[in-house]
């Protein structure tokens, strides 16, 4: 409670004699019955002891008087006041009640009783006592003030306002009454009136730090941050060591984006008061904004030690730990929290989400399910459970979880995104596209939604190349308008353009066990250090053995998963990169938005994505003349196409790949076709054409292998699609995940002829099939995505396997299936043929890339 206001005639305790109350005891006076000389003498002595602060003697003497005359009202009054002063409040209350039993019309005693009751928190009883006081003395301003304060403490704010205003009417010079009124008005949201009241208090008490502080709080609530900051600064001039005022000043400065001064103020606040949790919290947030996450963590840990169960604190600490890649510590933090609060749904949600990020999907599923048992309406937990189920191969269950999330929170963009991912993995491309479009209706700038939509368009035969290209361009224009930070152009010199060792950066989320590395690792391994100094920017959350191997091949390795786009762009510029190469395009976890900052003078896209990025400031795209014949596809790219002299790909087969097996048709007595491609490539149109092949080759069968066939509804759908084309389910074998890479390759031993899907060709699957002795029939299209196999087959010397029409595609497959001797000969020689081809000539391929890099550099300077 604030200091009590003073009036001309009233102090904390009301007394009929001047000076009595909280300051001095009441002196003896005659009552309507004459006091005995002994009692009067004792009372005078007690008052003297009281005034001399000889409290023990005063207590003894007052009690001696009351033993003689229990109805001695002045002795009761003074004894009650003394007991209260000594902290014996309950005894004081009992004494006041004795006095009121003798003299119920005593406003003074009712007032003192109210004070005592308020002190021990008996607010309703205190309210009643102050109301009794005012019935007896309606114009007693201090009683109105005290009643208002008790009402305020009970959050009876509207009544408190009326009482403070009555107190002000009776005590117009009471600064504290104006201050308290201002605080109540602020709590009621009457901010203009609150500010006015605090300013009136300052007119009466211009050197009150507390009043400036309260004014600052009201101005902050009004979002008048400049005025609030000025008020807090006045507070600190009067009281420099007030840590809370420094905290509130910093909050105002942060709102004004004066981050540097706010940081200094917060540092002073935590020095003055090391247990001021909010100061540590805001300081941590500022440090995180500057990228100093490690120091931010120190302050967040201080917060956590002070308030370990405050959700905002452990959530912020959790984020800081994750940002630094301290996943084990983040897990330990959550596990520790759950030991104390096993029924806290949000903690299970965070732990499940963390396990999701680490790829530990079974553990993620367990904790997310526990979160939903505790809080069935936690939409984001349903969404993240859906993601975990999808990644665990349970596509249909994952879709159900996403739908439940949408039912609870219809505008949850991520739920539509994850539903779209699952539908895409099931091969339900039109439905997936619709989900991605709904994601973007909710959040048009959501980057994963945009990239997944653009990626999905490549699978669908329903969109023309021009339509797909326009969608990419429109996205590029959209993000260009949103990009706020573009780094200044690096100055280039012609003097050393020929001899300079080029600093080439590669950025990818796939520097791990991923098919991209069958094509990237041989380049990294064979770069000439006299020509190129390599930098790898690994946007990888969960490094593995492949990550470690690539790190060992690279001159400079950067882990950038926890960097935002600005931080990553600054790092690329700091590394003085000459040529920055994107290896992901619009595939998952790409960093295309970082390229908008133009961190390198030459920016290139290559390898990971079969179409344009749509970004005008990615200058070039590396390809070849088979995948992108000059004049055929150039108009679909925002980048300038740079064609390598041979295949744009260089394949590194697994050194532990099993040997090529005999032609299975010899032992099986029938031809087996197959495809190990992702399901969105295997559209109903593809199945219809494959079914014609099966119908044309009696007793033949087809094997499709992809991890998503572990989901029973997905298997059933594909069997139904074949059945609709007249193919009995006994002729279709669907295989799910084979986790061991060598066992996966060995499974090609069950296939005689591989069928390439269209319009989206296989890449890794085509190379694997060829390496394992399995010829691949492909249908050439008019875009890069439908010409990758054209490049691969031409490079290894098998152009006869390339069809230009669906009819020719069927005819080539049927003809090859009908010629077992030729098929057997192809199988026997195919691995050697591939190994001797330019497809596996890593040295020449890398030299060609380095020559292109040099040409691009010379052109730029």
In which residue ranges do the predicted regions lie?
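Short coil/turn segments
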Residues: 678-679, 780-782
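Short hydrophobic "strand-cap" motifs at the C-terminus of beta-strands
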Residues: 507, 676-677, 705, 735
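A conserved nucleotide-sugar
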Residues: 531-533, 691-724
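Alpha-helical solenoid repeat scaffolds of the TPR/TPR-like class and their adjacent stem/linker regions
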Residues: 1-670, 720, 724-729, 733-734, ...
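Donor-sugar nucleotide-binding helix/loop cap in glycosyltransferases
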Residues: 755, 769
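Short hydrophobic signal-anchor/transmembrane segments that target glycosyltransferases
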Residues: 523-526, 684-698
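Substrate-binding clefts and catalytic carboxylate motifs of secreted carbohydrate-active enzymes
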Residues: 674-685
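Short Ser/Thr-rich beta->loop micro-motif in glycosyltransferases that lines
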Residues: 584, 756-760, 780
